Regions:
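Residues in and immediately flanking transmembrane alpha helices
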Residues: 15-16, 79, 307
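Active-site-adjacent loops and short helices of periplasmic peptidoglycan-processing enzymes
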Residues: 23-175, 179-188
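C-terminal segment of classical bacterial N-terminal signal peptides
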Residues: 14-23
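Positively charged n-region of N-terminal signal peptides that target proteins for export
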Residues: 1-8
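Residues in well-ordered beta-strands of folded domains
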Residues: 14, 86, 161, 220, ...
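Domain-terminus/edge residues, biased toward the C-terminal soluble/receptor-binding domains
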Residues: 155-156, 168-312
């Protein structure tokens, strides 16, 4: 008789978690006490929610807003990423003295280069310039499309008010960011760009030489990532750049893969004080993400379900 092969995977706990009581089976506190105000971790192979901490809590989106701008771009222009636009002067005042990739007004960029700038450097001018150009200057119309797509993806606690995240009206939740990231991961270009430790921006009209954009997701960089580096890290973005002289909360949305198992990590509003790696640039949400990556891959494993035709 032909053996029946099961088509689903089951999530099983390894020996390291067997000592925990059933009620704490998916609680990382025995390994690490999560300090973020909300968090959501999901295994994308099984859709099992591995960890949920107040995941519907509404929080400031900040730079994570760019994920929605990129989602809208890829939805409409995924096959046109090498098309070009000119960085408009009109957005200069709005993004002045904020996170950027030194993309100057009247310089010409491809859509792809703008995505690199957004994903690697959280560049506000890349998001606003692209949105302004593609909308014909109708930024309100672009934002309306962002909200429509967000709802189509399935978000229920998110509101978008600009293309880059500088406006405080941009709000989201951990579970919504999971849905948005999962949608983005369906685009090969997004996956490829997110995983790049660095990108060389070609020379432009006001840049006589090419220049390098280093990915702020230092967990991708074995050379310079230090204690943050994780081989399993595939890509991610924070709501703000690393802290140095100021203090505050930070959020990080990312995904990791090890031995064929993929997890999405949405860690929202980690306090500055939780980063104990000791570097001058503090990355509290990335710190908590790396600790939770360690917990997940040390505690869980994906195994084939039992063959129902095999005798025990």
């Amino acid at each position: 008789m032909k053996r029946i092969v099961t088509l689903f995977l089951s999530l099983i706990l390894l020996l390291s978690c067997l000592c925990a009581p059933a009620s704490a089976m998916f609680d990382p506190s025995l390994f690490y006490e999560v300090q973020a105000k909300s968090a959501y971790i999901v295994n994308t192979d099984t859709n099992i929610i591995v960890y949920d901490k107040d995941s519907s809590r509404q929080v400031p989106a900040g730079g994570l807003t760019k994920y929605m701008t990129i989602a809208l771009l890829l939805t409409n222009y995924a096959d046109q990423l090498d098309n070009t636009f000119q960085m408009p002067f009109a957005i200069s005042d709005y993004v002045h003295n904020s996170d950027n990739a030194d993309m100057r007004s009247n310089e010409t960029f491809t859509y792809r280069e703008a995505v690199y700038a957004m994903l690697l450097r959280n560049a506000n001018e890349a998001a606003m310039g692209l949105a302004y150009s593609l909308s014909g200057g109708d930024l309100a119309g672009w934002v309306s499309q962002m909200n429509t797509l967000s709802q189509r993806i399935g978000t229920t606690g998110s509101t978008w008010t600009d293309a880059c995240g500088l406006d405080s009206g941009n709000v989201t939740t951990a579970v919504d960011m999971y849905l948005i990231l999962r949608y983005l991961m369906s685009f090969d270009a997004f996956v490829d760009i997110s995983s790049a430790p660095a990108f060389t921006m070609p020379a432009k009209e006001k840049h006589t030489k090419s220049f390098v954009l280093l990915n702020q997701n230092v967990a991708l960089n074995k050379t310079s990532g230090g204690s943050f580096y994780r081989k399993s890290m595939q890509g991610g973005m924070c709501d703000v750049m690393a802290y140095k002289n100021d203090h505050g909360d930070q959020s990080y949305v990312s995904w990791a893969n090890q031995d064929g198992s993929t997890y999405i990590f949405c860690i929202m509003q980690s306090p500055d004080t939780c980063d104990t790696y000791g570097y001058a640039n503090r990355r509290p949400a990335l710190y908590e993400t790396t600790r939770l990556i360690d917990w997940v891959f040390q505690s869980f494993s994906i195994q084939p379900a039992l063959d129902t035709d095999l005798a025990l």
